[in-house]
Amino acid sequence: MWPERIKLIPPKYPVSRLEDMPEPNEESSGIDMQELKLRQRFMESGFNDNLKSHVGATGRYQIMPITGKEYTQITGKTGDLNDPVYNEQVRDFYMETRLPQFKVVSEGAPTDSVKIAKILAAYNWGPGNLSKHITRLKRRGVDVEKSLDWVDTMPAEPKNYVNFILRGQDIDKYRNNEEYQKALKKYGLK
């Protein structure tokens, strides 16, 4: 069972007991966004800024060309998706503006963790797939607004993606990854 609000678990060790979890800082959302971006980048590209997937997703955050074009049309900014700075700008734009349906819920405010989990799932699985899944869960009476238990009902890829980024699950697999360790040091997250 997920707690209502969580902080990202430091990569050194997974926290398994609720009472061991740090209290969220009142001034923040309870989510360390720098660590979240680092974990997301690791999941998307393994820190390979020039990675191109078989479906055409490019760069550190695996941006699809259509998303890059949409970013250019709306912002007027152009660039190469292989450019790490530009790729990150497109990712930030997409996360902040193109997934609004997962940020605000009319029936009671979801916790920050729930919002972030939905945005991550939509980023990885696609907003349409997530919307359909949430609709099915709500019909079955599953509360997707105040708990993160619904994350484990998704298919393996988006479930593992969200779990790794938010829970730090399977972090031991990656702890000895040289690129991950370099990035942790670079961002002072050792």
Predicted regions and their residues:
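Extracytoplasmic
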Residues: E35-L36, V55-T58, K115-I116
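Non-catalytic cell-wall polysaccharide-engagement segments
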Residues: W2-G30, I66-F93, T97-K190
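Structural recognition of the beta-strand scaffold that forms the well-ordered cores
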Residues: R39-F42, Q62, I119-A122
